[in-house]
């Protein structure tokens, strides 16, 4: 059978989006791996599935697969593309949408200027909830990475993140430390790794090594996690701007117990069909 799909991106973090509300198909991890290959498939960082909700209090169910076939809990840039997609496809007429993910419910707000704000929910710091192996909760942890002591914050934005502060974003050891920390035994579910350079109290630069995808042009949950880490450690103030290789996100966080708000663009690239 042929399935209609849409290619989209949020700041260069690119997605294949499938409407499984009006189309019916059983998508498996092997399909994500096959389609995600940039040489022999469609090519993307993540596959996003738009499904009918299980919960009557929400509008849609949102599932995410990395290009390696692994299913993940959350994707912030994908959430903005999800909102743009369901509106453009007339799956809803609402400008404010509630969506269930593997990690909980998020709220999407399509603004009049075309930007999309996502209520990502409150960050989680309890090690067991990230998950991260630590004797007790802390703002900063020192982790032994191949004999090198690396300081990092650990936080969950519905998916696990480690955040490292660096002095030079261009020479940050993303490809050296990224995969080592991603697979570090203290992160039993693997982890996304953010390399953060603080420019001033309102602006920072960020590169992210994403779990199951490698370095991407942008990572929405990574930007949220980096902002939370920077505010928690007293480096920055809310609201703030995070510059990623693919562009800029605006992040707001009022502190523990409060939701993180992320605002940025979502772009449709093309429509296509793929054989299942």
Curated annotation (Swiss-Prot):
Pathway: Amino-acid biosynthesis; L-lysine biosynthesis via DAP pathway; DL-2,6-diaminopimelate from LL-2,6-diaminopimelate: step 1/1. The record marks 161, 210 as: Could be important to modulate the pK values of the two catalytic cysteine residues. Its EC number is 5.1.1.7. Substrate binds at residues 13, 46, 66, 76-77, 159, 192, 210-211, 220-221. It is found in: Cytoplasm. GO terms for cellular component: cytosol. One of its GO terms (biological process) is lysine biosynthetic process via diaminopimelate. InterPro entries: DAP_epimerase_AS (IPR018510), DAP_epimerase_DapF (IPR001653). One of its GO terms (molecular function) is diaminopimelate epimerase activity. Disulfide bonds: none annotated. Keywords: Amino-acid biosynthesis, Cytoplasm, Isomerase, Lysine biosynthesis. Belongs to the diaminopimelate epimerase family. Catalyzes the stereoinversion of LL-2,6-diaminopimelate (L,L-DAP) to meso-diaminopimelate (meso-DAP), a precursor of L-lysine and an essential component of the bacterial peptidoglycan. Homodimer. This is Diaminopimelate epimerase. It comes from Pseudomonas syringae pv. syringae (strain B728a). The lineage of its organism: Bacteria, Pseudomonadati, Pseudomonadota, Gammaproteobacteria, Pseudomonadales. The gene is dapF.
């Amino acid at each position: 059978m042929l399935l209609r799909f849409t290619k989209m991106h949020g700041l260069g973090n690119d997605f294949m989006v499938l409407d499984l509300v009006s189309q019916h198909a059983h998508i498996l991890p092997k399909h994500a791996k096959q389609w995600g290959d940039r040489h022999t498939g469609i090519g993307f960082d993540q596959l996003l599935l738009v499904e009918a909700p299980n919960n009557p209090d929400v509008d849609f169910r949102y599932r995410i697969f990395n290009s390696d076939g692994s299913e993940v809990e959350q994707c912030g840039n994908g959430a903005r593309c999800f909102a743009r997609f369901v509106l453009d496809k007339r799956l809803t007429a609402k400008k404010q949408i509630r969506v269930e993910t593997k990690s909980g419910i998020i709220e999407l707000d399509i603004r009049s200027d075309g930007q999309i704000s996502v209520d990502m929910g409150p960050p989680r710091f309890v090690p067991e909830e990230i998950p991260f192996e630590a004797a007790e909760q802390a703002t900063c942890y020192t982790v032994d990475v191949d004999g090198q002591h690396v300081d990092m914050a650990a936080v969950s934005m519905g998916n696990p993140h480690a955040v490292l502060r660096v002095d030079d974003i261009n020479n940050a050891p993303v490809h050296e430390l990224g995969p080592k920390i991603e697979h570090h035994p203290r992160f039993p579910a693997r982890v996304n790794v953010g390399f953060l350079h603080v420019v001033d109290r309102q602006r920072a630069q960020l590169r992210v090594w994403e779990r199951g995808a490698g370095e991407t042009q942008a990572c929405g949950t990574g930007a949220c996690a980096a902002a939370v880490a920077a505010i928690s450690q007293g480096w920055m103030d809310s609201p703030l701007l995070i510059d990623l290789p693919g562009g800029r996100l605006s992040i707001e966080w009022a502190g523990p117990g409060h939701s993180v708000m992320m605002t940025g663009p979502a772009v449709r690239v093309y429509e296509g069909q793929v054989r299942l």
